[in-house]
């Protein structure tokens, strides 16, 4: 699967901080490491990652959270290394 640079950076960030399975973070926090003019592209990349089943969405009372899919971690590691 071919992903854009935003999606790869999001996967790297989530993997580095250990947001896998039960540990999740807000979608808004994923945007913080990107410039303000690119944050719309980050939201689009998150949607692509959810459709690809690489990120698991979690609805909370205080917004949308997400974590890496632990069943896809081997594929995620390969994508990050490229």
Residue positions per predicted region:
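Short, amphipathic alpha-helical interaction segments positioned at domain boundaries
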Residues: 71-82
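Short acidic, hydrophobic short linear motifs in intrinsically disordered regions
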Residues: 20-33
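Short amphipathic alpha-helical interaction segments
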Residues: 35-51
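Alpha-helix N-cap and coil->helix boundary residues
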Residues: 5, 22-25, 41-44
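Minor-groove-contacting beta-hairpin "wing" of winged helix-turn-helix DNA-binding domains
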Residues: 62-69
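A short, conserved structural fragment
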Residues: 50-60
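Short alpha-helical segments that sit at the start of domains
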Residues: 1-20, 80-82
């Amino acid at each position: 699967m071919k992903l854009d640079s935003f999606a790869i950076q999001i996967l790297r960030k989530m993997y580095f901080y250990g947001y896998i399975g039960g540990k999740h973070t807000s979608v808004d926090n994923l945007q913080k490491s990107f410039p303000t003019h690119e944050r719309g592209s980050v939201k689009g990349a998150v949607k692509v990652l959810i459709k690809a089943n690489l990120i698991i969405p979690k609805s909370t009372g205080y917004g949308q959270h997400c974590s890496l899919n632990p069943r896809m971690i081997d594929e995620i590691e390969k994508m990050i290394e490229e």
